[in-house]
Amino acid sequence: MADPENEVLRSTFPSYMAEGERLYLCGEFAKAAHSFSNALHLQSGDKNCLVARSKCFLKMGELEKSLEDAEASLQGDPTFCKGILQKAETLYTMGDFEFALVFYHRGYKLRPDREFKVGIQKAQEAINNSVGSPSSIKLENKGDLSFLSKQAESMRAQQKPHPVRQLIHHPKRESKRKGSLKSEKIVRQLLGELYVDKEYLEKLLLDEDLIKGTIKHGLTVEDLIMTGINYLETRSDFWRQQKPIYARERDRKLMQEKWLRDRKRRPSQTARYILKSLEDIDMLLTSGSAEGSLQKAEKVLKKVLEWNKEEVPNKDELVGNLYSCIGNAQIELGQMVAALQSHRKDLEIAKEYDLPDAKSRALDNIGRVFARVGKFQQAIDTWEEKIPLAKTTLEKTWLFHEIGRCYLELDQAWEAQSYGEKSQQCAEEEGDMEWQLNASVLVAQAQVKLRDFESAVNNFEKALERAKLVHNNEAQQAIINALDDANKGIIEELKKTNYREILKEKKEKENATMLDGQTRTAKEKETRKTKDEPEKVMKQWVQEQTEKQLEGVLSKETLGVTARQPEQRQREDPEKASWRKELGAKERGPGDTAKGQFGEAGRTEQNREETREIYRRPSELDQNLSDESSPRESEGLEKRLSKTDGGELEALGKTESGEIKEMEITENSEKIEKDEKEDEPIE
């Protein structure tokens, strides 16, 4: 078998580099480092290969080897950016944040890439985090320090020569100890607020009268001061060696402890924390992680509620903002009831502390929740309350559009058109083409519901032009479809209007014919009435006149007959009695006829009286008729009356004379019969 090393060395340098990069991406860092080593055997000192192998060592945790390869890549070219970046990354991983920051800055000056910028921020943050939060213990030049006496006495027995003596009698050792720190700047960054305490303790050492003083059990003030200084130095060394992740965990634990609640935070730290938290919450929500945004917001809200107003002057405004963030995350998660409660809390805080911007924000979000769940009228009421609080024209554009959209959903097309036109006007003032597009579509849709198809087509055409300007293909297609529907609506409306006009004309003709017929019949009736009235009046008048004359004649005749009867009886001769008997016997048959004639005469008389009563009218009717008749008619009536009066009177005279004669005959026959009955002998 052949030697594997010789077999490996038979490959080319690019093949080893490609193999190492592939293995590195697969996570096989040891094999990748071996491939890069083989490549360096073929081409030693290659900068890119050294940087690649340094990355593998860094992933494997061999930090020293990684640093050696990174420094080796810079030997030939100190400005090699990849080598500088790799060295900075290695130093950062080793915990040497200061030197890492130096190399990040050096690389950023040579080539301002994103990697160097991120490295600078990362190293600076690591330095700040490694310093940690201020400790709860702070030494002051007051109070009783006897609580340290027992601990100091036990430590004195175990300690080596006195530290003050070392400080006084061994200045070289002191300088060496101080020289262990890289610089006072590093110590200041590591200790943070405690660096002031360290300086204070060092100043106390210069006061010889103070350090000679003793406390209980023989413990001197000098011993206590040196104990504090030694503690701070050991702490700074420890924090410097920690990696950023451990420093963050330590800060997180310290923030949860009670001493942080009683201690004032720096305003700058509080502001940075709040701003950073709000940015993280917003970033998580916009990136699609609504659950993470909700958890982050609830966590920050819990912390802010623990602070007092001295630490956070605008605490109320911040709490309302966090409730708003929580509500927005709940909307994205579909938790509408919880979202409504969160936004209402935001609104309550805004009203309580008179925060107009927060009130506008809360009303906006509450309206969105109502619109999402389909309660459009409540959304309209909420957004209409927000209108006076809207500051910018663009905000009004959006607000009017949403209100109009809700009215359109409620089938209130007039209101939807009105708000759509307001939105369109504001969008034109702002010069926002997309909102002009949205407003035009809203107005057109409202006009379609109002069946104003011509105006709808005009607005759809405007919207189509704006959609082309903003290159919105989906909107263009939707508007084209809506235009087709609107044009079809116009055609249908024209058909309906034509049909309605035809029906209207037909009804008008029918009504006209009916009116003509009615007017004609009415006129004919009127003419008939006018013609018949004078004839009726004449007949009535003639009948009344004849009846009066008949009454007068009958009354005279009856009086004359009654007066003649006794005279005739006296004049009659007794001789004629027999003749009367014979005549009565002979004329018994004709007497019956006379009786029938007399009965008929009585009937005619009765009929005449009835007709007289029927045709008898009050004088007022005669007066009205006489008043209404014209002079010409009165003249005609007089002529007719004169003519008819003569003829009718003659006829009446004849009939009356005949009737009177018949009545006389019947009366005479009755009288004769009575006399005969009286003359007959009584058996």
Swiss-Prot record:
<dbReference type="InterPro" id="IPR040111">
    <property type="entry name" value="ODAD4"/>
</dbReference>
<dbReference type="InterPro" id="IPR019734">
    <property type="entry name" value="TPR_rpt"/>
</dbReference>
<comment type="function">
    <text>Component of the outer dynein arm-docking complex (ODA-DC) that mediates outer dynein arms (ODA) binding onto the doublet microtubule. Plays an essential role for the assembly of ODA-DC and for the docking of ODA in ciliary axoneme.</text>
</comment>
<comment type="subunit">
    <text>Component of the outer dynein arm-docking complex along with ODAD1, ODAD2 and ODAD3. Interacts with ODAD1; this interaction may facilitate the recruitment and/or attachment of outer dynein arm docking complex proteins, including ODAD1, ODAD3 and ODAD2, to ciliary axonemes. Interacts with components of the IFT complex A, including IFT140, TTC21B/IFT139 and WDR19/IFT144, and the IFT complex B, including IFT46, IFT52 and IFT57. Interacts with CFAP53.</text>
</comment>
<dbReference type="GO" id="GO:0007507">
    <property type="term" value="P:heart development"/>
</dbReference>
<feature type="repeat" description="TPR 1">
    <location>
        <begin position="13"/>
        <end position="46"/>
    </location>
</feature>
<keyword id="KW-0206">Cytoskeleton</keyword>
<feature type="region of interest" description="Disordered">
    <location>
        <begin position="510"/>
        <end position="537"/>
    </location>
</feature>
<keyword id="KW-0966">Cell projection</keyword>
<dbReference type="GO" id="GO:0005737">
    <property type="term" value="C:cytoplasm"/>
</dbReference>
<keyword id="KW-0802">TPR repeat</keyword>
<dbReference type="GO" id="GO:0120229">
    <property type="term" value="P:protein localization to motile cilium"/>
</dbReference>
<dbReference type="GO" id="GO:0030324">
    <property type="term" value="P:lung development"/>
</dbReference>
<dbReference type="GO" id="GO:0120197">
    <property type="term" value="P:mucociliary clearance"/>
</dbReference>
<feature type="repeat" description="TPR 2">
    <location>
        <begin position="47"/>
        <end position="80"/>
    </location>
</feature>
<dbReference type="Pfam" id="PF13181">
    <property type="entry name" value="TPR_8"/>
</dbReference>
<feature type="repeat" description="TPR 15">
    <location>
        <begin position="592"/>
        <end position="625"/>
    </location>
</feature>
<feature type="repeat" description="TPR 3">
    <location>
        <begin position="81"/>
        <end position="114"/>
    </location>
</feature>
<keyword id="KW-0677">Repeat</keyword>
<dbReference type="GO" id="GO:0007420">
    <property type="term" value="P:brain development"/>
</dbReference>
<feature type="region of interest" description="Disordered">
    <location>
        <begin position="553"/>
        <end position="683"/>
    </location>
</feature>
<keyword id="KW-0963">Cytoplasm</keyword>
<feature type="region of interest" description="Disordered">
    <location>
        <begin position="158"/>
        <end position="179"/>
    </location>
</feature>
<feature type="compositionally biased region" description="Basic and acidic residues">
    <location>
        <begin position="566"/>
        <end position="590"/>
    </location>
</feature>
<feature type="repeat" description="TPR 8">
    <location>
        <begin position="48"/>
        <end position="80"/>
    </location>
</feature>
<feature type="compositionally biased region" description="Basic and acidic residues">
    <location>
        <begin position="602"/>
        <end position="620"/>
    </location>
</feature>
<feature type="repeat" description="TPR 4">
    <location>
        <begin position="320"/>
        <end position="353"/>
    </location>
</feature>
<dbReference type="GO" id="GO:0060287">
    <property type="term" value="P:epithelial cilium movement involved in determination of left/right asymmetry"/>
</dbReference>
<dbReference type="GO" id="GO:0097728">
    <property type="term" value="C:9+0 motile cilium"/>
</dbReference>
<dbReference type="GO" id="GO:0090660">
    <property type="term" value="P:cerebrospinal fluid circulation"/>
</dbReference>
<protein>
    <recommendedName>
        <fullName>Outer dynein arm-docking complex subunit 4</fullName>
    </recommendedName>
</protein>
<feature type="repeat" description="TPR 5">
    <location>
        <begin position="360"/>
        <end position="393"/>
    </location>
</feature>
<dbReference type="GO" id="GO:0097729">
    <property type="term" value="C:9+2 motile cilium"/>
</dbReference>
<feature type="compositionally biased region" description="Basic and acidic residues">
    <location>
        <begin position="521"/>
        <end position="537"/>
    </location>
</feature>
<dbReference type="GO" id="GO:0003341">
    <property type="term" value="P:cilium movement"/>
</dbReference>
<feature type="repeat" description="TPR 10">
    <location>
        <begin position="275"/>
        <end position="311"/>
    </location>
</feature>
<feature type="compositionally biased region" description="Basic and acidic residues">
    <location>
        <begin position="629"/>
        <end position="675"/>
    </location>
</feature>
<dbReference type="InterPro" id="IPR011990">
    <property type="entry name" value="TPR-like_helical_dom_sf"/>
</dbReference>
<dbReference type="GO" id="GO:0120228">
    <property type="term" value="C:outer dynein arm docking complex"/>
</dbReference>
<dbReference type="GO" id="GO:0005576">
    <property type="term" value="C:extracellular region"/>
</dbReference>
<dbReference type="GO" id="GO:0036158">
    <property type="term" value="P:outer dynein arm assembly"/>
</dbReference>
<feature type="repeat" description="TPR 6">
    <location>
        <begin position="437"/>
        <end position="470"/>
    </location>
</feature>
